[in-house]
Amino acid sequence: MAPTIQTQAQREDGHRPNSHRTLPERSGVVCRVKYCNSLPDIPFDPKFITYPFDQNRFVQYKATSLEKQHKHDLLTEPDLGVTIDLINPDTYRIDPNVLLDPADEKLLEEEIQAPTSSKRSQQHAKVVPWMRKTEYISTEFNRYGISNEKPEVKIGVSVKQQFTEEEIYKDRDSQITAIEKTFEDAQKSISQHYSKPRVTPVEVMPVFPDFKMWINPCAQVIFDSDPAPKDTSGAAALEMMSQAMIRGMMDEEGNQFVAYFLPVEETLKKRKRDQEEEMDYAPDDVYDYKIAREYNWNVKNKASKGYEENYFFIFREGDGVYYNELETRVRLSKRRAKAGVQSGTNALLVVKHRDMNEKELEAQEARKAQLENHEPEEEEEEEMETEEKEAGGSDEEQEKGSSSEKEGSEDERSGSESEREEGDRDEASDKSGSGEDESSEDEARAARDKEEIFGSDADSEDDADSDDEDRGQAQGGSDNDSDSGSNGGGQRSRSHSRSRSASPFPSGSEHSAQEDGSEAAAPDSSEADSDSD
Protein backbone atom coordinates (compact mmCIF):
# COMPACT_ATOMS: atom_id res chain seq x y z
CA MET A 1 0.00 0.00 0.00
CA ALA A 2 1.40 3.41 -0.99
CA PRO A 3 2.34 5.75 1.88
CA THR A 4 0.08 8.72 2.66
CA ILE A 5 1.04 12.19 3.87
CA GLN A 6 -0.91 13.76 6.78
CA THR A 7 -0.71 17.48 7.59
CA GLN A 8 -0.77 19.06 11.09
CA ALA A 9 -4.36 20.27 10.68
CA GLN A 10 -5.47 16.80 9.71
CA ARG A 11 -3.72 15.39 12.78
CA GLU A 12 -5.55 17.78 15.12
CA ASP A 13 -8.86 16.94 13.46
CA GLY A 14 -8.15 13.27 13.92
CA HIS A 15 -7.82 13.64 17.71
CA ARG A 16 -11.26 15.34 17.87
CA PRO A 17 -13.91 12.90 16.69
CA ASN A 18 -16.99 14.19 14.92
CA SER A 19 -19.29 12.81 17.61
CA HIS A 20 -18.17 15.57 20.01
CA ARG A 21 -18.94 18.36 17.58
CA THR A 22 -22.43 19.35 18.72
CA LEU A 23 -24.34 22.38 17.66
CA PRO A 24 -25.52 24.77 20.39
CA GLU A 25 -29.06 24.11 21.54
CA ARG A 26 -31.60 26.35 19.96
CA SER A 27 -33.38 28.55 22.47
CA GLY A 28 -37.13 28.97 22.37
CA VAL A 29 -36.87 32.68 23.21
CA VAL A 30 -37.13 35.12 20.30
CA CYS A 31 -34.86 37.78 21.80
CA ARG A 32 -31.22 37.28 22.67
CA VAL A 33 -30.73 35.94 26.20
CA LYS A 34 -27.88 37.48 28.15
CA TYR A 35 -27.59 34.72 30.76
CA CYS A 36 -28.40 31.33 29.30
CA ASN A 37 -27.69 28.96 32.15
CA SER A 38 -29.58 25.70 31.82
CA LEU A 39 -31.62 24.27 34.68
CA PRO A 40 -29.97 21.58 36.80
CA ASP A 41 -31.05 17.98 36.53
CA ILE A 42 -33.73 16.64 38.85
CA PRO A 43 -31.95 15.05 41.82
CA PHE A 44 -34.40 12.13 42.05
CA ASP A 45 -36.83 10.26 39.90
CA PRO A 46 -40.44 11.49 39.76
CA LYS A 47 -42.93 9.74 42.04
CA PHE A 48 -46.56 9.32 41.10
CA ILE A 49 -48.32 9.91 44.44
CA THR A 50 -52.10 10.09 44.58
CA TYR A 51 -53.37 13.35 46.09
CA PRO A 52 -56.04 12.27 48.60
CA PHE A 53 -57.62 15.67 49.29
CA ASP A 54 -60.14 17.72 47.40
CA GLN A 55 -58.46 19.88 44.77
CA ASN A 56 -61.02 22.66 45.23
CA ARG A 57 -60.17 23.25 48.87
CA PHE A 58 -57.84 26.15 47.99
CA VAL A 59 -59.96 27.70 45.23
CA GLN A 60 -63.41 27.79 46.77
CA TYR A 61 -65.51 30.33 44.96
CA LYS A 62 -67.77 32.64 46.93
CA ALA A 63 -70.24 34.80 45.08
CA THR A 64 -70.31 38.51 45.87
CA SER A 65 -73.40 40.45 46.89
CA LEU A 66 -73.56 42.01 43.42
CA GLU A 67 -73.86 38.59 41.82
CA LYS A 68 -76.40 37.41 44.38
CA GLN A 69 -78.63 40.45 43.93
CA HIS A 70 -78.54 40.36 40.13
CA LYS A 71 -81.74 38.99 38.63
CA HIS A 72 -81.35 37.11 35.37
CA ASP A 73 -84.06 37.32 32.75
CA LEU A 74 -85.70 33.97 31.98
CA LEU A 75 -87.04 33.96 28.43
CA THR A 76 -89.28 30.90 28.32
CA GLU A 77 -92.49 29.79 26.73
CA PRO A 78 -95.76 30.63 28.49
CA ASP A 79 -96.42 26.97 29.30
CA LEU A 80 -92.73 26.23 30.05
CA GLY A 81 -92.81 23.43 27.52
CA VAL A 82 -95.35 21.43 29.57
CA THR A 83 -98.77 21.09 28.04
CA ILE A 84 -101.32 20.57 30.81
CA ASP A 85 -104.87 19.52 30.11
CA LEU A 86 -107.04 21.51 32.51
CA ILE A 87 -110.31 20.19 31.07
CA ASN A 88 -110.01 16.46 31.65
CA PRO A 89 -108.30 15.59 34.99
CA ASP A 90 -108.23 11.87 34.13
CA THR A 91 -105.61 12.49 31.46
CA TYR A 92 -102.71 12.21 33.87
CA ARG A 93 -104.15 9.62 36.23
CA ILE A 94 -101.87 6.60 36.62
CA ASP A 95 -103.39 3.14 36.60
CA PRO A 96 -101.63 1.04 39.29
CA ASN A 97 -102.73 -2.24 37.67
CA VAL A 98 -100.82 -1.67 34.44
CA LEU A 99 -97.98 -4.16 33.89
CA LEU A 100 -94.60 -2.67 33.10
CA ASP A 101 -92.63 -3.63 30.06
CA PRO A 102 -89.78 -6.09 30.79
CA ALA A 103 -87.26 -3.52 29.57
CA ASP A 104 -88.61 -0.94 32.04
CA GLU A 105 -88.57 -3.44 34.90
CA LYS A 106 -84.86 -4.00 34.39
CA LEU A 107 -84.24 -0.28 34.66
CA LEU A 108 -86.05 -0.11 38.00
CA GLU A 109 -84.11 -2.99 39.55
CA GLU A 110 -81.28 -2.15 41.96
CA GLU A 111 -77.81 -3.06 40.80
CA ILE A 112 -76.12 -5.42 43.25
CA GLN A 113 -72.46 -6.09 42.61
CA ALA A 114 -71.57 -9.61 43.69
CA PRO A 115 -68.18 -9.81 45.39
CA THR A 116 -65.53 -11.75 43.51
CA SER A 117 -64.57 -14.90 45.39
CA SER A 118 -61.67 -15.93 43.19
CA LYS A 119 -58.60 -16.45 45.37
CA ARG A 120 -56.30 -16.12 42.38
CA SER A 121 -57.75 -12.74 41.45
CA GLN A 122 -57.37 -11.51 45.04
CA GLN A 123 -53.73 -12.55 45.12
CA HIS A 124 -53.10 -10.94 41.77
CA ALA A 125 -54.59 -7.63 42.90
CA LYS A 126 -52.24 -7.25 45.85
CA VAL A 127 -50.08 -4.13 45.95
CA VAL A 128 -46.53 -4.30 47.26
CA PRO A 129 -45.59 -0.72 48.23
CA TRP A 130 -41.83 -1.38 48.37
CA MET A 131 -41.68 -2.92 44.89
CA ARG A 132 -41.03 -0.55 42.01
CA LYS A 133 -43.02 -0.94 38.83
CA THR A 134 -41.07 -1.94 35.76
CA GLU A 135 -43.34 -0.06 33.36
CA TYR A 136 -43.47 3.70 33.00
CA ILE A 137 -47.16 3.92 32.16
CA SER A 138 -49.51 1.79 34.20
CA THR A 139 -53.25 1.51 33.68
CA GLU A 140 -53.69 0.53 37.36
CA PHE A 141 -55.82 -2.41 36.21
CA ASN A 142 -54.90 -6.04 35.78
CA ARG A 143 -56.38 -8.61 33.50
CA TYR A 144 -59.02 -9.55 36.06
CA GLY A 145 -60.50 -6.07 35.92
CA ILE A 146 -59.91 -5.28 39.63
CA SER A 147 -58.44 -1.91 40.42
CA ASN A 148 -54.88 -2.11 41.67
CA GLU A 149 -55.17 1.25 43.40
CA LYS A 150 -55.68 0.69 47.12
CA PRO A 151 -56.83 3.61 49.29
CA GLU A 152 -54.78 2.20 52.19
CA VAL A 153 -51.52 3.23 50.51
CA LYS A 154 -52.63 6.83 49.96
CA ILE A 155 -51.23 9.68 51.97
CA GLY A 156 -53.61 10.82 54.70
CA VAL A 157 -56.52 8.82 56.07
CA SER A 158 -57.82 5.45 55.02
CA VAL A 159 -60.62 6.38 52.66
CA LYS A 160 -61.82 2.83 52.18
CA GLN A 161 -62.11 2.15 55.91
CA GLN A 162 -64.02 5.39 56.37
CA PHE A 163 -66.66 4.39 53.81
CA THR A 164 -66.95 0.76 54.94
CA GLU A 165 -67.47 1.63 58.61
CA GLU A 166 -70.24 4.16 57.95
CA GLU A 167 -73.66 2.63 57.50
CA ILE A 168 -75.75 4.60 55.07
CA TYR A 169 -79.50 4.39 55.65
CA LYS A 170 -81.24 5.17 52.39
CA ASP A 171 -84.89 4.75 53.33
CA ARG A 172 -87.07 5.53 56.35
CA ASP A 173 -87.62 1.89 57.36
CA SER A 174 -83.90 1.22 57.69
CA GLN A 175 -83.52 4.31 59.87
CA ILE A 176 -86.35 3.18 62.16
CA THR A 177 -84.84 -0.31 62.40
CA ALA A 178 -81.43 1.13 63.27
CA ILE A 179 -82.93 3.35 65.99
CA GLU A 180 -84.84 0.44 67.53
CA LYS A 181 -81.69 -1.66 67.46
CA THR A 182 -79.89 0.89 69.65
CA PHE A 183 -82.47 0.37 72.41
CA GLU A 184 -82.06 -3.40 72.14
CA ASP A 185 -78.26 -3.15 72.26
CA ALA A 186 -78.42 -0.93 75.34
CA GLN A 187 -80.28 -3.66 77.25
CA LYS A 188 -77.64 -6.31 76.53
CA SER A 189 -75.17 -7.01 79.30
CA ILE A 190 -71.51 -6.18 78.63
CA SER A 191 -69.40 -9.31 79.05
CA GLN A 192 -66.19 -8.40 77.25
CA HIS A 193 -64.42 -5.60 75.39
CA TYR A 194 -65.65 -4.92 71.88
CA SER A 195 -62.17 -5.28 70.34
CA LYS A 196 -60.15 -7.07 73.07
CA PRO A 197 -61.68 -10.47 73.90
CA ARG A 198 -59.52 -11.03 76.98
CA VAL A 199 -60.55 -7.76 78.64
CA THR A 200 -63.62 -8.10 80.86
CA PRO A 201 -65.46 -5.32 82.74
CA VAL A 202 -64.86 -4.85 86.45
CA GLU A 203 -67.93 -2.65 86.96
CA VAL A 204 -70.73 -1.56 84.64
CA MET A 205 -72.23 1.88 85.28
CA PRO A 206 -74.96 3.70 83.33
CA VAL A 207 -74.12 6.95 81.53
CA PHE A 208 -76.57 9.87 81.70
CA PRO A 209 -76.49 13.61 80.96
CA ASP A 210 -75.60 15.68 83.99
CA PHE A 211 -78.92 17.41 84.69
CA LYS A 212 -77.52 18.86 87.91
CA MET A 213 -74.48 20.70 86.49
CA TRP A 214 -75.61 21.23 82.87
CA ILE A 215 -77.04 24.63 83.76
CA ASN A 216 -73.50 25.95 84.32
CA PRO A 217 -71.52 26.53 81.07
CA CYS A 218 -68.09 24.93 81.35
CA ALA A 219 -64.89 25.88 79.52
CA GLN A 220 -61.70 23.93 78.87
CA VAL A 221 -58.58 25.97 79.59
CA ILE A 222 -55.35 24.67 78.04
CA PHE A 223 -51.98 26.01 79.21
CA ASP A 224 -48.80 25.85 77.14
CA SER A 225 -46.84 24.80 80.25
CA ASP A 226 -47.43 23.87 83.87
CA PRO A 227 -48.87 26.98 85.61
CA ALA A 228 -47.95 25.72 89.07
CA PRO A 229 -45.69 28.04 91.11
CA LYS A 230 -42.03 27.07 91.13
CA ASP A 231 -41.59 27.26 94.91
CA THR A 232 -44.35 24.70 95.63
CA SER A 233 -44.87 21.15 94.45
CA GLY A 234 -46.90 18.05 95.18
CA ALA A 235 -50.18 18.23 97.08
CA ALA A 236 -49.73 21.92 97.97
CA ALA A 237 -49.40 22.91 94.30
CA LEU A 238 -52.46 20.86 93.33
CA GLU A 239 -54.46 22.47 96.14
CA MET A 240 -53.55 25.96 94.93
CA MET A 241 -54.23 25.22 91.27
CA SER A 242 -57.60 23.62 92.08
CA GLN A 243 -58.74 27.01 93.43
CA ALA A 244 -57.03 29.18 90.78
CA MET A 245 -58.95 31.77 88.77
CA ILE A 246 -58.38 33.46 85.39
CA ARG A 247 -59.41 37.03 84.78
CA GLY A 248 -59.21 39.37 81.77
CA MET A 249 -57.11 42.49 82.34
CA MET A 250 -55.70 45.43 80.36
CA ASP A 251 -52.24 47.02 80.54
CA GLU A 252 -51.26 50.69 80.21
CA GLU A 253 -51.12 50.47 76.40
CA GLY A 254 -54.66 49.12 76.23
CA ASN A 255 -53.67 45.55 75.31
CA GLN A 256 -55.89 42.85 76.76
CA PHE A 257 -54.46 39.74 78.39
CA VAL A 258 -55.50 37.00 80.78
CA ALA A 259 -54.16 36.98 84.34
CA TYR A 260 -53.76 33.74 86.29
CA PHE A 261 -54.53 34.24 89.99
CA LEU A 262 -53.63 31.88 92.85
CA PRO A 263 -55.13 32.03 96.36
CA VAL A 264 -53.11 33.45 99.24
CA GLU A 265 -52.50 31.48 102.44
CA GLU A 266 -55.41 33.11 104.25
CA THR A 267 -57.76 32.22 101.40
CA LEU A 268 -56.58 28.60 101.47
CA LYS A 269 -57.42 28.44 105.18
CA LYS A 270 -60.88 29.92 104.57
CA ARG A 271 -61.60 27.46 101.75
CA LYS A 272 -60.47 24.55 103.93
CA ARG A 273 -62.71 25.78 106.74
CA ASP A 274 -65.67 26.01 104.35
CA GLN A 275 -65.01 22.47 103.14
CA GLU A 276 -64.91 21.11 106.69
CA GLU A 277 -68.17 22.87 107.53
CA GLU A 278 -69.71 21.46 104.29
CA MET A 279 -70.55 24.86 102.84
CA ASP A 280 -69.63 26.43 99.50
CA TYR A 281 -68.62 29.81 100.88
CA ALA A 282 -69.19 32.19 103.77
CA PRO A 283 -71.48 35.04 102.66
CA ASP A 284 -69.62 37.75 104.60
CA ASP A 285 -66.04 36.58 103.94
CA VAL A 286 -63.70 38.05 101.33
CA TYR A 287 -61.22 35.82 99.47
CA ASP A 288 -57.95 37.31 98.18
CA TYR A 289 -56.03 36.04 95.14
CA LYS A 290 -52.62 37.17 93.91
CA ILE A 291 -51.55 37.27 90.28
CA ALA A 292 -49.08 34.55 89.27
CA ARG A 293 -48.78 34.60 85.46
CA GLU A 294 -49.87 36.56 82.39
CA TYR A 295 -51.11 34.86 79.23
CA ASN A 296 -52.30 35.63 75.72
CA TRP A 297 -55.63 33.96 75.01
CA ASN A 298 -57.38 32.31 72.08
CA VAL A 299 -61.05 31.35 72.44
CA LYS A 300 -63.04 28.89 70.32
CA ASN A 301 -66.69 28.03 70.80
CA LYS A 302 -69.53 26.43 68.87
CA ALA A 303 -69.81 29.45 66.59
CA SER A 304 -66.14 29.12 65.52
CA LYS A 305 -65.27 27.29 62.31
CA GLY A 306 -63.70 23.87 62.78
CA TYR A 307 -64.79 23.53 66.41
CA GLU A 308 -64.98 19.94 67.67
CA GLU A 309 -67.41 18.90 70.36
CA ASN A 310 -65.84 18.05 73.70
CA TYR A 311 -67.32 16.41 76.79
CA PHE A 312 -66.13 15.40 80.25
CA PHE A 313 -67.40 12.70 82.60
CA ILE A 314 -68.24 12.81 86.31
CA PHE A 315 -68.14 9.55 88.28
CA ARG A 316 -70.53 9.51 91.25
CA GLU A 317 -70.27 6.52 93.55
CA GLY A 318 -73.40 4.41 93.65
CA ASP A 319 -75.19 6.68 91.18
CA GLY A 320 -73.56 6.33 87.78
CA VAL A 321 -71.52 8.27 85.25
CA TYR A 322 -72.67 11.69 84.07
CA TYR A 323 -71.35 13.67 81.14
CA ASN A 324 -71.31 17.41 80.58
CA GLU A 325 -70.41 19.63 77.64
CA LEU A 326 -67.33 21.83 77.26
CA GLU A 327 -68.74 24.43 74.90
CA THR A 328 -65.71 26.78 75.02
CA ARG A 329 -62.02 26.05 74.56
CA VAL A 330 -59.47 28.62 75.76
CA ARG A 331 -55.78 28.27 74.85
CA LEU A 332 -53.37 30.30 76.95
CA SER A 333 -49.79 31.04 75.88
CA LYS A 334 -47.21 32.89 77.94
CA ARG A 335 -47.15 36.65 77.44
CA ARG A 336 -43.78 38.20 76.68
CA ALA A 337 -42.75 41.12 78.82
CA LYS A 338 -42.35 44.37 76.83
CA ALA A 339 -39.74 46.97 77.60
CA GLY A 340 -41.11 50.08 79.30
CA VAL A 341 -44.49 48.52 80.10
CA GLN A 342 -45.40 48.13 83.76
CA SER A 343 -46.26 44.55 84.64
CA GLY A 344 -49.32 43.70 86.67
CA THR A 345 -47.48 41.26 88.95
CA ASN A 346 -48.63 43.15 92.07
CA ALA A 347 -52.33 42.97 91.17
CA LEU A 348 -54.65 41.58 93.84
CA LEU A 349 -58.04 40.01 93.12
CA VAL A 350 -60.63 40.35 95.90
CA VAL A 351 -63.54 37.91 95.56
CA LYS A 352 -66.84 38.22 97.40
CA HIS A 353 -69.65 35.79 96.61
CA ARG A 354 -73.20 36.93 95.85
CA ASP A 355 -76.50 35.44 94.75
CA MET A 356 -77.26 35.11 91.04
CA ASN A 357 -79.28 37.83 89.36
CA GLU A 358 -82.28 37.37 87.08
CA LYS A 359 -80.20 37.41 83.90
CA GLU A 360 -77.97 34.58 85.10
CA LEU A 361 -80.94 32.54 86.30
CA GLU A 362 -82.62 32.92 82.90
CA ALA A 363 -79.43 31.72 81.19
CA GLN A 364 -79.42 28.63 83.42
CA GLU A 365 -83.06 27.90 82.62
CA ALA A 366 -82.28 28.21 78.90
CA ARG A 367 -79.43 25.69 79.20
CA LYS A 368 -81.68 23.32 81.14
CA ALA A 369 -84.36 23.61 78.46
CA GLN A 370 -81.70 22.94 75.81
CA LEU A 371 -80.80 19.68 77.56
CA GLU A 372 -84.43 18.65 77.77
CA ASN A 373 -84.75 19.37 74.02
CA HIS A 374 -87.50 21.95 74.35
CA GLU A 375 -87.83 25.60 75.26
CA PRO A 376 -89.68 26.80 78.36
CA GLU A 377 -93.32 27.24 77.42
CA GLU A 378 -94.59 29.66 80.03
CA GLU A 379 -97.33 30.98 77.78
CA GLU A 380 -98.75 27.51 77.20
CA GLU A 381 -98.79 26.80 80.94
CA GLU A 382 -100.68 30.03 81.59
CA GLU A 383 -103.19 29.11 78.88
CA MET A 384 -103.71 25.68 80.47
CA GLU A 385 -104.35 27.29 83.87
CA THR A 386 -106.90 29.71 82.39
CA GLU A 387 -108.66 26.83 80.62
CA GLU A 388 -108.87 24.86 83.88
CA LYS A 389 -110.30 27.88 85.67
CA GLU A 390 -112.85 28.39 82.91
CA ALA A 391 -113.78 24.71 83.04
CA GLY A 392 -114.30 24.94 86.83
CA GLY A 393 -116.38 28.09 86.42
CA SER A 394 -118.56 26.42 83.78
CA ASP A 395 -119.33 23.55 86.19
CA GLU A 396 -120.54 26.01 88.81
CA GLU A 397 -122.63 27.81 86.23
CA GLN A 398 -124.26 24.52 85.21
CA GLU A 399 -125.48 24.08 88.76
CA LYS A 400 -126.89 27.63 88.90
CA GLY A 401 -128.94 27.67 85.72
CA SER A 402 -129.23 27.22 81.97
CA SER A 403 -128.79 30.94 81.24
CA SER A 404 -125.32 31.00 82.77
CA GLU A 405 -124.42 27.88 80.76
CA LYS A 406 -125.15 29.67 77.52
CA GLU A 407 -123.06 32.66 78.52
CA GLY A 408 -120.16 30.47 79.64
CA SER A 409 -120.24 28.45 76.40
CA GLU A 410 -120.16 31.63 74.33
CA ASP A 411 -117.20 32.93 76.34
CA GLU A 412 -115.35 29.65 75.92
CA ARG A 413 -115.95 29.66 72.17
CA SER A 414 -114.68 33.22 71.81
CA GLY A 415 -111.71 32.41 74.05
CA SER A 416 -110.83 29.29 72.02
CA GLU A 417 -111.05 31.24 68.78
CA SER A 418 -108.74 33.95 70.15
CA GLU A 419 -106.32 31.28 71.38
CA ARG A 420 -106.25 29.69 67.93
CA GLU A 421 -105.55 33.06 66.32
CA GLU A 422 -102.75 33.73 68.81
CA GLY A 423 -101.31 30.25 68.18
CA ASP A 424 -101.31 30.86 64.41
CA ARG A 425 -99.56 34.19 64.94
CA ASP A 426 -96.97 32.57 67.23
CA GLU A 427 -96.29 29.84 64.66
CA ALA A 428 -95.84 32.41 61.88
CA SER A 429 -93.51 34.50 64.04
CA ASP A 430 -91.51 31.38 65.04
CA LYS A 431 -91.04 30.41 61.38
CA SER A 432 -90.00 33.92 60.34
CA GLY A 433 -87.61 34.33 63.25
CA SER A 434 -85.98 30.88 63.14
CA GLY A 435 -83.16 32.07 60.90
CA GLU A 436 -82.56 35.14 63.06
CA ASP A 437 -82.46 33.03 66.26
CA GLU A 438 -79.65 30.83 64.92
CA SER A 439 -77.44 33.81 64.07
CA SER A 440 -78.32 35.60 67.31
CA GLU A 441 -77.43 32.47 69.34
CA ASP A 442 -73.94 32.36 67.80
CA GLU A 443 -73.40 36.07 68.48
CA ALA A 444 -74.71 35.76 72.04
CA ARG A 445 -72.42 32.78 72.72
CA ALA A 446 -69.35 34.68 71.50
CA ALA A 447 -70.32 37.75 73.55
CA ARG A 448 -70.88 35.60 76.63
CA ASP A 449 -67.40 34.02 76.30
CA LYS A 450 -65.83 37.47 76.15
CA GLU A 451 -67.97 38.63 79.07
CA GLU A 452 -66.84 35.70 81.22
CA ILE A 453 -63.18 36.59 80.67
CA PHE A 454 -63.25 40.41 80.60
CA GLY A 455 -66.47 41.20 82.51
CA SER A 456 -69.46 43.30 81.41
CA ASP A 457 -70.72 46.85 81.76
CA ALA A 458 -73.88 45.73 83.57
CA ASP A 459 -71.81 44.08 86.29
CA SER A 460 -69.77 47.24 86.79
CA GLU A 461 -73.00 49.27 87.22
CA ASP A 462 -74.33 46.77 89.78
CA ASP A 463 -71.01 46.91 91.56
CA ALA A 464 -71.14 50.72 91.68
CA ASP A 465 -74.56 50.50 93.36
CA SER A 466 -73.22 47.99 95.86
CA ASP A 467 -70.32 50.36 96.61
CA ASP A 468 -72.79 53.12 97.54
CA GLU A 469 -74.65 50.76 99.86
CA ASP A 470 -71.40 49.61 101.49
CA ARG A 471 -70.32 53.21 102.09
CA GLY A 472 -73.65 54.01 103.75
CA GLN A 473 -73.47 50.96 106.02
CA ALA A 474 -69.78 51.21 106.91
CA GLN A 475 -68.92 52.50 110.42
CA GLY A 476 -65.51 53.47 111.80
CA GLY A 477 -63.92 53.23 108.36
CA SER A 478 -64.31 49.42 108.17
CA ASP A 479 -64.77 47.82 104.74
CA ASN A 480 -64.75 44.30 103.32
CA ASP A 481 -62.62 45.31 100.36
CA SER A 482 -58.86 45.57 100.78
CA ASP A 483 -56.81 48.09 98.78
CA SER A 484 -53.12 47.79 98.01
CA GLY A 485 -51.24 51.12 97.90
CA SER A 486 -47.92 52.18 96.47
CA ASN A 487 -45.60 55.20 96.74
CA GLY A 488 -47.28 57.07 93.91
CA GLY A 489 -50.84 56.06 94.83
CA GLY A 490 -52.90 53.08 93.72
CA GLN A 491 -55.52 52.57 91.03
CA ARG A 492 -58.72 50.88 92.18
CA SER A 493 -61.12 49.04 89.87
CA ARG A 494 -64.11 46.88 90.72
CA SER A 495 -65.74 44.34 88.44
CA HIS A 496 -67.85 41.21 88.60
CA SER A 497 -66.45 37.95 87.29
CA ARG A 498 -68.11 34.67 86.51
CA SER A 499 -66.15 31.47 86.22
CA ARG A 500 -67.38 27.95 85.75
CA SER A 501 -66.05 24.57 86.83
CA ALA A 502 -65.59 21.45 84.78
CA SER A 503 -64.66 19.36 87.79
CA PRO A 504 -65.74 15.72 88.07
CA PHE A 505 -65.20 15.88 91.85
CA PRO A 506 -67.87 16.95 94.32
CA SER A 507 -65.57 19.60 95.73
CA GLY A 508 -66.33 21.68 92.64
CA SER A 509 -62.90 22.21 91.05
CA GLU A 510 -60.31 20.26 89.09
CA HIS A 511 -56.90 20.93 87.67
CA SER A 512 -54.61 18.54 85.80
CA ALA A 513 -51.00 19.46 85.09
CA GLN A 514 -48.74 17.96 82.42
CA GLU A 515 -45.27 18.63 81.10
CA ASP A 516 -46.31 19.77 77.63
CA GLY A 517 -49.70 21.26 78.51
CA SER A 518 -52.14 21.35 81.38
CA GLU A 519 -55.86 21.85 81.50
CA ALA A 520 -57.96 23.56 84.15
CA ALA A 521 -61.51 24.68 84.64
CA ALA A 522 -63.06 26.92 87.24
CA PRO A 523 -66.61 26.88 88.77
CA ASP A 524 -69.22 29.07 90.42
CA SER A 525 -70.71 32.52 90.09
CA SER A 526 -68.81 35.09 92.15
CA GLU A 527 -68.27 38.82 92.58
CA ALA A 528 -64.65 39.88 92.18
CA ASP A 529 -63.00 43.16 93.15
CA SER A 530 -59.53 43.60 91.63
CA ASP A 531 -57.06 46.05 93.21
CA SER A 532 -53.88 46.64 91.22
CA ASP A 533 -50.79 48.76 91.92
Curated annotation (Swiss-Prot):
Bias category Basic and acidic residues: which stretches?
A: 361-374, 399-434, 442-453
Where is it predominantly found?
A: nucleus
Q: What is this protein called?
A: RNA polymerase II-associated factor 1 homolog
Check the record and name the InterPro entries matching this protein.
RNA_pol_II-assoc_Paf1
Q: Which GO terms describe its biological process?
A: cellular response to lipopolysaccharide; endodermal cell fate commitment; mRNA 3'-end processing; negative regulation of myeloid cell differentiation; negative regulation of transcription by RNA polymerase II; positive regulation of cell cycle G1/S phase transition; transcription elongation by RNA polymerase II; Wnt signaling pathway
UniProt similarity note: Belongs to the PAF1 family.
Quaternary structure, from the entry: Component of the PAF1 complex, which consists of CDC73, PAF1, LEO1, CTR9, RTF1 and SKIC8. The PAF1 complex interacts with PHF5A. Interacts with POLR2A, TCEA1, SKIC3, KMT2A/MLL1, SUPT5H, RNF20 and RNF40. Interacts with UBE2E1.
Protein's cellular compartments = Nucleus
Which residue intervals are annotated with compositional bias (Acidic residues) in the record?
375-398, 458-470
Crosslink feature (Glycyl lysine isopeptide (Lys-Gly) (interchain with G-Cter in SUMO2)) location: K133, K154
Biological source species: Pongo abelii
